[in-house]
Amino acid sequence: MLTVNALIEWIGNEAQGESVIERILWLDEMSDLTYVIDVNANKLPYAKTISEYKVALDTEEAIMLDKDPFSRVVDEELLSEKAKAIRDRAWEAISSIVILEPEIYYPRERAKHVKTVAQKYGLSEKVIYKYLKRYWIRGKIVNALLPDYDRCGGRGKERNSKGIKRGRPRKHADIVGDGINVDEEIK
């Protein structure tokens, strides 16, 4: 049974990395049409037929994934104010157009709506498309727009400088010196 937000993995030659995972964004049983997005590619949604999925699932060319790699439980109280502000700003920008299904999946209609929203909120069209793709790929939920701060940096890891000074070179290095890297001896 196909549903919105279901993840379908097309089994290809996995040794060559040809496996594709698609998320179903919209279904219309009457016209045998669905819009999907490849979760591993930075591309926009495209149309496929529902019957194509049914045949692929029956012949095991594709499987329905039980676990969503993008789902994460988020405690609202543990989010920083900055992360909430980023999410809310992105949601405010795209909330009026993501509800326009299936129209938002038609390239010409989507372009018109994106242009309107970009002008209204003073953002570039590229940023609006980035928000839309992130929203669709991560499961059509508002928290999909949260920044990935938890995946940034190497908290607790020691940096290896190899003798080269890290950071921007000083403007007046000839007067104040080149600067140094902080290591265990200096700490």
Language model segments and positions:
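Secondary-structure boundary/capping micro-motif
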Residues: 1-187
